[in-house]
Each structure stands twice: as C-alpha cells, then as structure tokens.
C-alpha cells in the first residue's frame, strides 16, 4: 500500500504490522538515534534497498511528534538534494518511515579521502545545499538543524550529489518562530538571543558549514581546559551573538576574497541583512569562476582531524546555564516583555553571557521547565550505556550522550544524542499532506498550528533554587503569538522550574 496509512486523523485506520513485513525485509538495526532505530530494508517486490526509521509511540509524545513532523514535511518536498520519502506505515504502536538509501559518506570522510581538495570542491558542496535550502524556503519551510552531519553523499560515485537528511525539526514558517532549537555551534544569533526568527537561520548555518569546509575549524571554537565547559559555553554564545569570528592566519591565507565575502554575508548578525539562499546561489563564488583551484587539502584535513576527530565540539554544551545567562535581562524584575520582539535583545544577551548569573554547580544534567534549555556535561570517556538517550515513557526528561538539547514532553528542553537543540512539545504547526496546518491529536499526522503552555515537569529529585518565571514569549509557536498559560500552570512551572537528572 503506497505510503501505508497516512490519514492519521482517523485513529481506527492503522496498518497491521504484517503489512510492513509483507512488503519489506527489515534487517538488523544499523544505527540508533535519539528518536528512532534505523534499519536497512529491502523491498520484496523490487529488491531495492531503502532506509527505514522506526519510531516507537510508547517512547513518549516527543517521539510521536518527531515522527509526525518528519512525515508531514517530507510529504511536501521533492528535490534532488533532499533525501526522499518512499513509504510510510503507521501501526497502533509504531511509525515506519521508508526513505531513499544514501550509500555515500559524510562530507568530512569524503574530504579526508581525496587526493586533491580545493575551494571549487567546497563551492560544489555549498551550491547543492543552497539549492535545496532555497527550494525549502520557497515552500516556507525552515530546516532549523542544518549541519555537516546531516549532509551525505548519495552514493560513492565520483560525481555523487549531496543530499540533506533529518527533517524532524523542520517547520513551516507560518509567522516568526521563537522556540530555540538546533545544534549549538550552528545556532544563529537571533536564536541564541531568544528573538523571533525564520528562514535566515538556515543561511547562517550554511555560512558555518562553509567556514568549516574551507578552514577545518568551526568559526566560534576555542581551546579550553578539558572540563572547562562553563567558559566554553559562555564564550561560544557570546561570540555567536556578537558575530565574533575571524579569517585567521594561516588557515585562511590561501582562501579567495570571494569565499570570505560569501561567508561574511551568510553570517551577517542582523537577520534582515543576511543574504538569502537564492541570492547566495548567484554569488560569484558559487555561480562564477571566483572559487580557487588551489589544493588546500593538507591544511584543512589537519584541522579537521584536530578539531573533529576528537569530537570535542559535539560534546555536551551546557545550554541550560547559557540560556539562563542569556535570559538574565528578561528575568531581572523589569517590566514584562510584550509579544513583540525586543530590540537590542542580542546585546543584552551578550552582556548576560559575559557576566551573568552563576551556572548550576557541578557537572550535572539539568532540565528547566520554563523553556530554558537542558544541559549535560560530558567528559571524553562518557559514552557509556547509562548516559544513553532512550526517551522516557513517563514524560520525564532523559539525559543524552552528548549534552545537546532535545524536546521533552513537559515543556522543558532536554539533552539529546545528535548534538541538536529541539523545542519543547508545544503542538506547533507542522504541515499536513496538502500543505495546510491541521489540528493535532495524539495520533494525528500533524500537530496543530498553535502553541500551548506545556505542563510542568515532574518533581525534581534534587531541587535547585528557582529562577524567575520566563516571559510569555519564550516558546511561541509558528504563528508568532505568545502561548496561553493559566495561573495554575505558572505556579506549577515556578515551583518545579528545574530538575536534576544526573550527577556525574
């Protein structure tokens, strides 16, 4: 049955598990991600191989939301540089999403294997990403989690195309978005500054990707003591907010001025002045002959191995501490903020990041209930099973393996496994199959285009001092309106503002 059962509004209309196994052979699990298990599946009729993502409904609302969101977005898109949806089955217990199988390598691996690597190679990669993103933006879709890990080669042929994957955070821009999500090192200033944002955040992320591909260094990374995550976090967000990066020597000595110009325009701090994906495609470094043919492999590969082989920057980023600092001006007891975006919010956040509230003590994973991001400190050897990212079934926040942030079912933002920051479960707008935002039910295909106040988290095992109640604009939905909240919810949110998940 093509696309299985996708009319999830009728709760009684489910696929039987046998429908999946009658059509596909599911092999062993090849990868376990935050929300799902990934299989390599074979179509019994055609013999063609696909990727299958299996989401367990029992793993919680955030898992169900991620599955429904990915289905809704992927059904809207068809582009050669986007991994395409093949089939969908929804049983009473599971979602099965079948996608094209990309057999190529990640971009980093491809670069390391090349005998010759130049700006022109980078230009080819960035052009394909820009074309896919320009297409998404034409549909008013914001990916919100563009990063190198989500870019893969479709196959292992020499001229293989690049494809973008992982759409569980993508969102229709039915108005400016406020909820923070993404991967910390790729976050745009307006996301860090808790301002409303939209499609320009994807262009910023492409600028970060381009910077890394040309130098082997992330733009906002610096050496810190092994466990000094507090200073790393503070400096990371402060630099992002200020746009404080450099084309430092010797890494950029051989890079063309045209390449630097495009990076600068993609990483413009003011989102309304940032170049669009469509405009970037016409830039001389992409469409012209401005990209150099000089071999830069040795320098780039040396920095890639130094910065990324250790995976240090993918590790825990103490987002809760940073977000509390960044929100300090909003919580200082001044007049409550209105629904409109606050001018100068980024500047206030810079000041807060530089000398704001003290961080939570210890290397603990902390979850906030008012929209603050959850954090998890992680040392080099913390890949053990007891820090796994298995979603909790009781609605509680579950710590992850790399300290990044993913959605909880209680309105907080909790640690994830893929380095991404995902919003709380707010029933935000997700596209229906015909492109309309439709009301959500627990089993429906798409969440409704509204924001609601998330229920407070469970009582914390180790309570921390409460902080000021976040303002009503902290987790707005795609409509740009503040989420409604009752006095009871506010009181509960204040009383249970944070919880200690794990102490190292």
From Swiss-Prot:
Subunit structure comment from the entry: Interacts with calmodulin, in the presence of calcium.
Cited InterPro entries: Kinase-like_dom_sf, Prot_kinase_dom
Annotated membrane topology: Peripheral membrane protein
Keywords on record: Calmodulin-binding, Cell membrane, Cytoplasmic vesicle, Membrane, Phosphoprotein
UniProt record similarity statement: Belongs to the protein kinase superfamily. CAMK Ser/Thr protein kinase family.
PANTHER family linked: SERINE/THREONINE-PROTEIN KINASE
Native source species: Rattus norvegicus (Rat)
Entries under Gene3D superfamilies matching the protein: Phosphorylase Kinase, domain 1, Transferase(Phosphotransferase) domain 1
Domain Protein kinase: 24-286
Name of the featured protein: CaM kinase-like vesicle-associated protein
Listed Low complexity bias regions: 445-470
Location within or outside the cell: Cell membrane; Cytoplasmic vesicle membrane
UniProt gene name: Camkv
A Pfam family: Pkinase
């Amino acid at each position: 049955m093509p696309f299985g059962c996708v009319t999830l509004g009728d709760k009684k209309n489910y696929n039987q598990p046998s429908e999946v196994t009658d059509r596909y052979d599911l092999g062993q699990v090849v990868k376990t991600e935050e929300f799902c298990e990934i299989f390599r599946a074979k179509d019994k009729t055609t013999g063609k191989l696909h990727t299958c993502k299996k989401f367990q409904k029992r793993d919680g609302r955030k898992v169900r939301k991620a599955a429904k969101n990915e289905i809704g977005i992927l059904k809207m898109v068809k582009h050669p540089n986007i991994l395409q949806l093949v089939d969908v089955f929804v049983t009473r217990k599971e979602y099965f999403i079948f996608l094209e199988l990309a057999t190529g390598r990640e971009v980093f691996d491809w670069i390391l294997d090349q005998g010759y690597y130049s700006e022109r190679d980078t230009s080819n990669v960035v052009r394909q990403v820009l074309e896919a993103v320009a297409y998404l933006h034409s549909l008013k879709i914001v990916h919100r989690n563009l990063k190198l890990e989500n870019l893969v080669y479709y196959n292992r042929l020499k001229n293989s195309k690049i494809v973008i994957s992982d759409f569980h955070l993508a969102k229709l821009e039915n108005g400016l978005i406020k909820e923070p999500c993404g991967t910390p090192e790729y976050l745009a200033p307006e996301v860090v500054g808790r301002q409303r944002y939209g499609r320009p955040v994807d262009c910023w992320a492409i600028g970060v990707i381009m910077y890394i591909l040309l130098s082997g260094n992330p733009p906002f990374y610096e050496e810190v003591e092994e466990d000094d995550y507090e200073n790393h976090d503070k400096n990371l967000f402060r630099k992002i907010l200020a746009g404080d990066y450099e084309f430092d020597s010797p890494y950029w000595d051989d890079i063309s001025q045209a390449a630097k110009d495009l990076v600068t325009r993609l990483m413009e701090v003011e989102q309304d002045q940032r170049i669009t994906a469509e405009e970037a495609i016409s830039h001389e470094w992409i469409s012209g002959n401005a990209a150099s043919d000089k071999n830069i492999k040795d320098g780039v590969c040396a920095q890639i191995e130094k910065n990324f082989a250790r995976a240090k920057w993918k590790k825990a980023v103490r987002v809760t501490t940073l977000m509390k600092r960044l929100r300090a001006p909003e919580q200082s007891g001044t007049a409550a903020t209105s629904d409109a975006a606050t001018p100068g919010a980024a500047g206030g956040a810079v000041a807060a990041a530089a000398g704001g509230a003290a961080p939570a003590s210890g290397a603990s994973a902390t979850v906030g209930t008012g929209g603050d991001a959850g954090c998890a400190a992680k040392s080099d050897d913390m890949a053990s099973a007891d820090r796994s990212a298995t979603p909790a079934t009781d609605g509680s926040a579950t710590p992850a393996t790399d300290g990044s942030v993913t959605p909880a079912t209680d309105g907080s933002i909790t640690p994830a496994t893929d380095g991404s920051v995902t919003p709380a479960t707010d029933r935000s707008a997700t596209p229906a199959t015909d492109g309309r935002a439709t009301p959500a039910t627990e089993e429906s295909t798409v969440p409704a285009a509204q924001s609601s106040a998330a229920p407070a988290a469970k009582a914390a095992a180790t309570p921390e001092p409460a902080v000021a109640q976040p303002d009503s604009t902290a987790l707005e939905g795609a409509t740009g309106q503040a989420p409604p909240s009752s006095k009871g919810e506010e009181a509960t949110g204040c009383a249970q503002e944070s919880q200690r998940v794990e102490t190292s």
